[in-house]
Amino acid sequence: MNRCNDETLQGFISLPKRIWQTSLLLYDMVNLIIENIEYCSFSQSSIVKRGDEAIMYEELSAPLPDKKRYLERIGFTGELKPNLDTLNRLILAQLHTVPFENLDGYDVGRDILLDTESLFDKIVVQGRGGYCFELNGLFMSLLQDIGFDCYPVMVRVVWMATGYMPISHCAGIVTIEGIRYFCDVGFGGPAPCSALRLDDPGEQQSGANRFVFAQAPDGDFIIYRTVDGGREQLLKFNDRPCQNVDFLAPNEYLSQNKQSGFKQMRMINIAREGGSAAINNNVLRLHQGGQVEETLLDTEDKLREALLNYFGLAVSFPLKL
C-alpha cells in the first residue's frame, strides 16, 4: 500500500508542520497494521486470511459450534445455569484442562486466528491450548451460549513491570443478578481461579491466593495479589466493553513481531490440584505445596513427553531446543 496519494499529501502539508508530520507517522502505523494482518476490502467486511479463505468480521463473534463438545473438553458435568456457582466451576474446569501455551507462535510461527471456528478447532477439536486472546475469547463464547451476561475487556499486564505497559491481554466481565465479576482463564501468571467481585474493595480469596481491586487515578481497575504481607500488582484494565475485533492488532503484534516475548520464549502453564506446572523455554517447573521442582528438557523427546504428560498436548510439529 502506498504511503499516501498526492491529494492526501497536499492535505497534510496544509497543516502546521508538527501536525502533518505526526499525521504521516500515524498513517504509516495504520498501514503497517493493515499490511501485517492482511486486511482485505473493508467493503466486504473481511479481515484476515485462513489459508486462502477470507475470515469475515462476523466470524469473530460467531456462536459456539458445539457447547456439549466444549464441556467434554474441560471435563465439566452438572447443571448449566447462568449463576455464580456454574461460572466458578467452569473457570476451575478450564484452568485444569486447557493450558496457556504459545507453541504456534514460538515453535511454528503460525498465525493466531481469533474467529470462533478456528478457536474451537484448535482448543476443542485438536485438544490444544492458547494464549489470552484465544482462551478468553472462546470462553466468552461458551458463557454467552449458556446465557451469561458477559463481555470482553482490554487489559494491561503490570505484573513485574515498570513504566506504562501497552494493552497485551484480555479478560471478561460477567454480570450476575446485578453484580459484576471479573474472570480470566487466559493469564499465564498467578491469576485467580474463580470469579472476583469487581466492585468489592476488600480482599477476596481465590484458591490459595488473595486478591484485591483498587482504582488507579485514571479510573482503571488494578488487581493486586497479597504476597508475604504486601501486595503485588497483576493486571490493569478498564471496564468498558470491547468487541472481539478490537483484539486483532495486539494479537498480531504479540504473535508475529520479533520483539514480542511470545516470539522469544516458550511459555506454557496449567493449574493442577494444589499447584501448577509450567514450561519456560526448555525448563519444566512443577509447583506443589510451596515447593518447586525443576527439570531441564534437553531433548525433543523429553519436551514432547512433558507436553503430553503434564499439559495434555500431543503435537507433531518440530519443537525448538
Give, region by region, the residue ranges found by the protein language model.
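Short beta-strand scaffold segments in enzyme catalytic cores
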Residues: 170-172
